[in-house]
């Protein structure tokens, strides 16, 4: 992969209210997501899917992060977290667990911010358990509001996601956060 392409796989470090200084990991191409949220800052979802796919190689993602980490060290910038906050849903990446394991070699905590859509899957929970900090999105407690706000992939079921979040809480040893977009119906 060319340097210009590698540079698109990570960004920062940037200030984060929750994570201090974080270096963003962009493991998903733009707008590949399992949701099409009405409030998405990235615009319309281009590829709505729930199939986990290989988007980039683990080596390319790690090399991109390494380049940014080295550049930050040269500037005496601290990095508190390597944060998976891509332009789509990070758990759609079938290599997420391997990427987290490979990035741990830098000695920096790993965070993943997810819309929780695939948390019902055991393989996704297993991958997320390798991170140090995970945030899962909860925008609605009813199927009607959930579809209205998050416009989820039609094959997803809110009950499965809610159960998966409960299962994940009992399996995960790190810091577990949730985030919610409040809206007026």
Q: PLM features: residue spans?
A:
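Auxiliary Fe-S-binding modules of radical SAM enzymes
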Residues: 1-21, 59-63, 70
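Canonical Radical SAM [4Fe-4S] cluster-binding loop centered on the CxxxCxxC motif
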Residues: 17-60
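Short glycine-centered, acidic/aromatic-flanked micro-motifs in structured strand/loop junctions
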Residues: 27, 84-86, 180-182
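Short strand->helix junction
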Residues: 30, 47, 89-90, 183
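Conserved alpha-helical substructure of the radical SAM core
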Residues: 43-83, 98
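Conserved AdoMet/S-adenosylmethionine-binding subsite of the radical SAM
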Residues: 91-185
């Amino acid at each position: 992969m060319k340097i210009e392409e590698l540079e698109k796989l990570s960004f920062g470090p940037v200030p984060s209210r929750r994570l201090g200084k974080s270096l963003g990991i962009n493991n998903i191409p733009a707008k590949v997501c399992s949701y099409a949220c009405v409030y998405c800052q990235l615009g319309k979802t281009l590829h709505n899917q729930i199939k986990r796919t290989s988007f980039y190689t683990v080596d390319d993602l790690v090399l991109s992060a390494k380049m940014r980490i080295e550049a930050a060290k040269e500037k005496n910038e601290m990095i508190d977290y390597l944060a998976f906050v891509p332009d789509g849903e990070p758990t759609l990446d079938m290599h997420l667990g391997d990427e987290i394991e490979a990035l741990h070699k830098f000695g920096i905590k790993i965070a993943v911010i997810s819309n929780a859509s695939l948390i019902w899957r055991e393989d996704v929970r297993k991958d997320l358990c390798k991170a140090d900090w995970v945030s899962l999105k909860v925008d609605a407690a009813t199927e009607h509001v959930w579809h209205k706000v998050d416009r989820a992939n039609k094959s997803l079921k809110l009950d499965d996601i809610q159960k998966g979040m409960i299962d994940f809480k009992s399996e995960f040893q790190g810091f577990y956060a949730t985030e919610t977009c409040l809206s007026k119906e």
